[in-house]
C-alpha cells in the first residue's frame, strides 16, 4: 500500500512539474509575439538593441545590472506612457499585454 501511495505521489508531482514547464513555455511564446510585433524594431530580437535602438539609447535587456535596477512598475510606466524617444504604447496594448511584455523582457536576464 505504501509503495502504491508513494508511486501516486511521485506521479502527481511529475504532472505538476510538467504542467508548470509547459505553462511557462506557452507564456513565453505569447509574450514573444507581442514583443516581436511592438518592441523588436528598436530593442532587437536578442534584447541588446538594434543599431537604430542603440542610437536612440535603448537599454540592454541582457545587462544584469539594468535588470536588477529596473522594476516591473518602471517598465510598465515606460511602455504605457513612453520614455525619452520611445513612443507610448498604452493606447495600442492592453494592460495585460504590457505586463506580458515586461515578463518577456525578464527572460533576457542572465541566468
Predicted regions, residues:
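Short microdomains enriched in Cys/His and/or Lys/Arg
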Residues: 62-73
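Axial heme c-ligation environment in periplasmic c-type cytochrome domains
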Residues: 54-59, 77-109
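Electrostatic cytochrome c docking/interface patches
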Residues: 16-34, 50
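Bacterial N-terminal signal peptides
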Residues: 8-18
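Stable alpha-helical elements in mature extracytoplasmic
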Residues: 31-35, 71, 75, 82, ...
Amino acid at each position: 500500500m505504501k509503495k502504491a501511495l508513494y508511486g501516486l505521489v511521485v506521479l502527481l508531482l511529475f504532472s505538476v512539474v510538467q504542467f508548470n514547464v509547459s505553462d511557462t513555455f506557452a507564456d513565453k511564446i505569447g509574450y514573444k509575439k507581442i514583443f516581436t510585433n511592438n518592441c523588436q524594431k528598436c530593442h532587437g530580437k536578442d534584447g541588446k538593441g538594434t543599431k537604430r535602438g542603440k542610437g536612440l539609447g535603448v537599454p540592454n535587456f541582457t545587462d544584469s545590472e539594468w535588470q536588477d535596477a529596473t522594476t516591473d512598475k518602471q517598465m510598465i510606466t515606460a511602455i504605457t506612457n513612453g520614455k525619452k524617444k520611445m513612443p507610448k504604447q498604452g493606447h495600442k496594448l492592453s494592460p495585460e499585454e504590457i505586463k506580458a511584455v515586461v515578463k518577456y523582457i525578464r527572460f533576457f536576464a542572465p541566468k
